[in-house]
Amino acid sequence: MIKDGHEVGFHGYIHEAPNSLSRSDEQYWMQRSIDTIVKHTGKRPRGNRSPLYNFSNNTADLLVEEGFLYDSSLMGDDVPYLLKTKKGELVELPTNWATDDWPPYVHSIDLNYVMQIMSPDRAMEIFMAEFEAMRETGGGLWIGIWHPFVSGRLSRWKRVEKMIEHMLGTGDVWFATLEEIAQHIIQCRKNGIYSPRVDQLPYYENPVVPKRTRRPQRRAGPDK
């Protein structure tokens, strides 16, 4: 993968859930992963996709501190936008479960994820519906999330191959790494071509607890 020039991003070290960790523990696993990626690729990762898309109140700040350019864990839009924190900014390249191969294919008692397995044709129908909708906008973002042990099975990969051939055959689709897309968004913003939405993080400093509503009390008096 490295030899062929594919981008290597951060996706946790042991698939830990950031939103279940303290800030120091999240930082520890992030640093271990970064060190491992640098060891094998010679450069630091520029992008993150959190395991299971889990995002903590500290994730964005830690990514900025470590020099990350973008995140691709959130699902707040169909197009790229910005995450702004006290530490700086990140480009958010949003994804969604409809382009992830986990829902249609994974059936694992060990992982406590038991779903009816879809046929490759049905899964590709869902993926392609998302792709065609993005393509019709003339500037949409479509990100496939495929796991080697899931989509890599032969019956499924044959359909992935056909889907990619179809995408290439359109002649108007840009195949790019997420880092290239993030750099493109930054340049378009500088040139005034694109004004992405900006989300200020964290949305809330503390857990939001709904106020308990008081039930109206009955007035004392004779029953009717």
Language model features with spans:
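Glycine-rich, positively charged active-site loop/lid region within alpha/beta enzyme cores that binds
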Residues: 94-114
